[in-house]
Amino acid sequence: MSCNQQKECCKKECQEKECCKECCCPRIKAFKKFINTFEKAQIGKEAPEFKAPAYCPCGSIKEIDINEYRGKYVVLLFYPLDWTFVCPTEMIGYSELAGQLKEINCEVIGVSVDSVYCHQAWCEADKSKGGVGKLTFPLVSDIKRCISIKYGMLNVEAGIARRGYVIIDDKGKVRYIQMNDDGIGRSTEETIRIVKAIQFSDEHGAVCPLNWKPGKDTIEPTPDGIKKYLTAH
């Protein structure tokens, strides 16, 4: 951003280096003010609604309506951009995981700010050319950034989604929000562990302790329950 686009207070600093500080950049400041007008995703609250075009596993472009996923758990997988570096490893990994998630009534939806045609080209490209090949879940185009804003996943300065995901339960409520630095890939094993923990807690009313996995002990959420668990462990 040039000095002509900055406030007077920033011009001196801009002569030495590019400046994108919120206090000095009117465009970023105005955009952040606009973002604050949106209701953001919150744990335990209804997941923000959206409809958007997506490139689907069948090879066609269709509209995704998050409301149509009621009755299922959803992993809403935000990522920075197609044709990058960590992102393809994650999309391929979650594509392999999608079958296991379907077995427990959970779907994966990828979301980035790329166009559906960029998604299509990425999925049709061979891995030797930086593509991801055919995925088993849809890639939504959030080209207007509205979905990323609603779910608190937009990197405002870069204008792209952050590397994070949101788990929505079968009743349409947000149950888990996680975000990584752009250079750190996620764990598919941790994702499925969290989904199973949410489902177990919903079904049985128990709570899941540190490092819980299916088959491990849970805790009855009462004073006696935690005493019993801590004594046994």
From Swiss-Prot:
GO terms for molecular function: thioredoxin peroxidase activity. It catalyses: a hydroperoxide + [thioredoxin]-dithiol = an alcohol + [thioredoxin]-disulfide + H2O. It is a peripheral membrane protein. Pfam families: 1-cysPrx_C, AhpC-TSA. One of its GO terms (cellular component) is plasma membrane. PROSITE patterns: THIOREDOXIN_2. One of its GO terms (biological process) is cell redox homeostasis. Keywords: Antioxidant, Cell membrane, Disulfide bond, Membrane, Oxidoreductase, Peroxidase, Redox-active center. Residues 41-200 form the Thioredoxin domain. It is an enzyme of class 1 (oxidoreductase). The keyword Transcription regulation does not apply. It is found in: Cell membrane. Coiled coil: none annotated. Its EC number is 1.11.1.24. It comes from the Eukaryota. The active site is a conserved redox-active cysteine residue, the peroxidatic cysteine (C(P)), which makes the nucleophilic attack on the peroxide substrate. The peroxide oxidizes the C(P)-SH to cysteine sulfenic acid (C(P)-SOH), which then reacts with another cysteine residue, the resolving cysteine (C(R)), to form a disulfide bridge. The disulfide is subsequently reduced by an appropriate electron donor to complete the catalytic cycle. In this typical 2-Cys peroxiredoxin, C(R) is provided by the other dimeric subunit to form an intersubunit disulfide. Belongs to the peroxiredoxin family. AhpC/Prx1 subfamily. Homodimer; disulfide-linked, upon oxidation. This is Putative peroxiredoxin. It comes from Entamoeba histolytica (strain ATCC 30459 / HM-1:IMSS / ABRM).
